[in-house]
Amino acid sequence: MIILTIRTEKPDSEIGLYDGQTQLAYETWPAHRQLAETIHRKIEALLAGHQKGWQDVQGIVCFQGPGSFTGLRIGLTVANALSYSYQLPIVATQNPEWLEMGIRRLEAGEDDSLALPFYGADAHITLPKK
């Protein structure tokens, strides 16, 4: 089972490609404020670098938090859009063993249908001054 993994709650974002529990590729890059611009290219390059296309991917595992509001929002939006577009099962996990747990859940046939963020606290959104 070929699985794409996505983790974007930190300044350094991570994507991976797995065949079951076996890591085929894993990349970390300093995405910071360019995450929305870079994540799609990084995923496409990861797949192409291993002679894989979307027809080969059978599921998506993503880290749902806690972490950066914006980083989680971007990463989960990309994961959900890919899941919907390619009709792939998606699972989201939030503990230190997120990757192993997510892969096990996919292999067991689980599908969250929609990966939701877990921020760990209220989002700090600036209130209007008036």
Tell where the protein language model's regions lie, with residue ranges.
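Oxyanion-binding and handling regions
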Residues: 1-44, 48-54, 88-130
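Short glycine-rich anion-binding loops that position phosphate/pyrophosphate groups of nucleotides
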Residues: 11, 65-66
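A generic secondary-structure micro-motif detector
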Residues: 33, 68-69
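DPxDG-like acidic metal-binding loop motif
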Residues: 59-64, 70-88
